């Protein structure tokens, strides 16, 4: 019989996280849950295909990077929402981190190039109907940065929890929304809407930042940090298209997509087209750099 006042420990629930390791006994493997990680690689080919393990590991690593990118993006969104100078400096710092991560993703795609196309074909059919289209974290990332496409929900029709995550991202303000709200509070012309006229006005409105950087130094840093991250994401997409074409040519994707022809349509996409377009509308440099009359 238990002593008066004592409580029996509750049985662990299925799926509950393991109890924390006592202080002072934490190991590297415990902290990083290495044993759990190593149990997650489960190739499906039978008999096993040697190269499938590489395929699984590379894509799992991408998903871990996507998780970190979402973590950083949510913090950046919060800082833009606050809008004070201290928060904007933190946003700039984190945006530079995001750009570094996105840059690191590019050579990782090249790891798959070490697999011969014929080797990939040895297990590719076993993946159907799984597809990169179903990477809900990548779709969340696109939404969080401003590329919102409700049609992507169709790829998660059989996964209600994942679909709900993407729905929340579709409804929440994106980084692009946050930037627009910030610029409007600071007196910039940033109309809402997707029309060409609204886009042109937004791009022209940013001229003030670049043509008078001494008056808008922090905003210029913010815009350039957003642009650099945007550029690295665009380069990642380009690397991805080349890798896919190198592996499967113009075949359709395992999930029924058009494969490379579809991916090529995404290459011109930008999260912040106005920052790119602002370059077109610049007419002079800062006053201190203007040539003598």
Locations of the language-model features?
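Surface-exposed peri-terminal alpha-helical interaction modules
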Residues: 2-293
